[in-house]
């Protein structure tokens, strides 16, 4: 209703909660009204994925893609691009913007990024007033203030917030003494009597990790003092002297996830070099 009434819309909802339905409706309205819709993402990989998704729905003739090094059907009715590309188009006063009426800003929480945030800010400020903005995010900490700011620099903005997770987020810790012992997958948080996850750390996990630390210390000929006796100056306050916990091999983790039937999954490695070595 808000989009049909001409409002901007900001959607803050967990992953899988249906944020893209709002974006899809904006694209539908653009097609019905014979105007253009842009779909922006923060990275090329997301742009490429969204481009292929939209091509499946609307066909290659109606969908374009613009990233730093790719240009496909740039004058299409629906164009997917990185946010930086849209910012550059605004500063260049591109003719492509003439029929633009809807802009979907996916991952709009990037506005808070200290390095790239100004790009989102410039886009929101400099887009023509005839354009309606649809902001999508799963993580906006100050979503009410953000919505008010958009309304202040543009026009009426409808805020849609949902905190319910259609797919519950469950967190576990993989614990293993060494490559010769069976791994354990222990809940990070306690569960209540109904089996629901709470926000309190799982005492079983803390106890198991403490047990592994003591065993590791014993193997190194060190004796860990009882924490209940206190004391702040002991060698165990030196983090560099604490026994290192076992780091499982990647293939072993994947094998276990496969055995538990919870693949596919994403294995995060926080460096490009590490990713190259893992392959």
Region spans (language model):
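Conserved P-loop/Walker A NTP-binding site and adjacent catalytic elements of P-loop NTPases
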Residues: 1-175, 265-268
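Conserved interdomain linker/interface between the two RecA-like ATPase lobes of SF2 helicase motors
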Residues: 125, 132-134, 139-279
